[in-house]
């Protein structure tokens, strides 16, 4: 970035004089929460009766003891791995007879070793995962007959089963070799990326449902903000010039629209953040270091049309959620034209997107509540697994056949856990 930037901590000016069409849009959009929407039948599927899952009983050092050591794991955005375990333990989908199971689940919490600042330390995650798989392969016959092809694992970290927070090193490491036949349930989703393999199930990051629901405003509240965003534009500690972080997309948002009265954008995170999103028509969801973030969840739940700025993103539950119908996609290179793009969308298109977002079943797909509720994120994962059935012939190995190489990996990853 050649121009010297104004501090991104300053808030863009609130709307002063808006075009008449925009004011009409606000007037029209205030009552769409109750509008009927079409095209969301698949997210209402009930997976019960369509598959059976066997949950391995592991020593508590792989799961319960880790949470007992640091309860912060229950509220960070990687907590899906914990709550998926709890969901399955009490679900009608669970079977106690492994011989009748369609899928096998290994409850290992690989993102629960946290720094004092709450960031996961994943240096030991590959060793922990390898140890858990060795355990199930020793005491049960089911892993060995498929080498994991009928097993699924929840790996919700930044770059999933690559187990590293920096992309370059995550790509260099690649997906943990012993997981290459398994189905991975992960938040990271980017096309043609070393950390997303074919057949993976992309899910939303964990956002506490009770926290979100505590901030709901009346559905008739007018949407008086045109474009809303709170978050970093520059990661000055890791990328001072702003050209690499978010591939420059966030920096471009700030430099082009910091003085635009239709854009309410800032790095400040107010206490009214959730309420503000419910007063906005569009919520920006740009990539950061990875394509995904909790903003996507928040935008959908709060009925704010997600503006997705992440060229190669693979969105959560994309086989069921009609993302093209509820979101707006803007190419990273087109960010300088963002104002023109958004103001050019016909009012009827915006109202249709808002009507679909207002559907309770749409909001439910983004959440992992406790206890589980019909149509929530847990059920969407189970539906995605059910759609993969029946397993193909290539899932089961011939007697004596081996595919995975247990000696493959870095020297550090091969150490005992």
From Swiss-Prot:
Ranges of the Lumenal topological domain: 37-417
Q: Which residues lie on this side of the membrane: Cytoplasmic?
A: 1-15
Q: Name one GO cellular component term.
A: Golgi membrane
Task: Give the primary localization class.
Answer: Golgi
Q: List the disulfide bonds.
A: none
* An annotated Gene Ontology molecular function: glycosyltransferase activity
One Pfam family matching this protein: Exostosin_GT47
InterPro entries tied to this protein: Exostosin (IPR004263), Exostosin_GT47 (IPR040911)
Carbohydrate attachment residues: 144, 405
Q: Where in the cell is it found?
A: Golgi apparatus membrane
Question: Transmembrane helix among the record's keywords?
Answer: yes
> What EC number(s) has UniProt assigned to this enzyme?
2.4.-.-
Q: Where are the transmembrane segments?
A: 16-36
Q: Relate the protein's function as given in its record.
A: Involved in the synthesis of glucuronoxylan hemicellulose in secondary cell walls.
Its name, as the record gives it, is Probable glucuronosyltransferase GUT1
Q: Which organism is it from?
A: Oryza sativa subsp. japonica
Gene encoding it?
GUT1
